[in-house]
């Protein structure tokens, strides 16, 4: 399971060794997919490179329309980018609240192929 909460059946050292071995491949895969997004999507909707590690973030006005088209094409993307306001009780963050409603995160890991990345760019470009 993706969020397996059971205890590890290895030492911390063994676990971190696995991460260290796999990390270069993970980084290379993310960079390959991110390059497709950078080249095929308008620069005006891309967040800066500092934001593209976990997923590839874009900011769009018509988020729901874009998401509907993405899912209709058999692809997937995320919106799990809440406003930071929820972390600070009683504090209003109007800019963050508005921006959170326009962010879509595109997958850039081993679950998403280069062909899927190109296809999702075509879908997004046809809608925006």
Please report, for each region that a protein language model flagged, where it lies by residue:
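PLP-dependent aminotransferase class I/II
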Residues: 1-128
């Amino acid at each position: 399971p993706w969020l397996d909460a059971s205890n590890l059946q290895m030492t911390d050292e063994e676990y971190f060794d696995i991460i260290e071995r796999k990390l270069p491949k993970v980084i290379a895969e993310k960079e390959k997919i991110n390059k497709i997004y950078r080249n095929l999507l308008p620069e005006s909707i891309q967040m800066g490179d500092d934001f593209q590690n976990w997923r590839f973030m874009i900011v769009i006005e018509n988020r729901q329309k874009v998401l509907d088209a993405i899912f209709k094409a058999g692809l997937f993307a995320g919106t799990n980018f809440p406003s930071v306001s929820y972390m600070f009780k009683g504090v209003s963050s109007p800019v963050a609240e508005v921006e959170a409603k326009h962010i879509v995160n595109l997958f850039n890991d081993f679950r998403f192929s280069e062909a899927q990345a190109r296809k999702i760019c075509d879908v997004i470009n046809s809608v925006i």
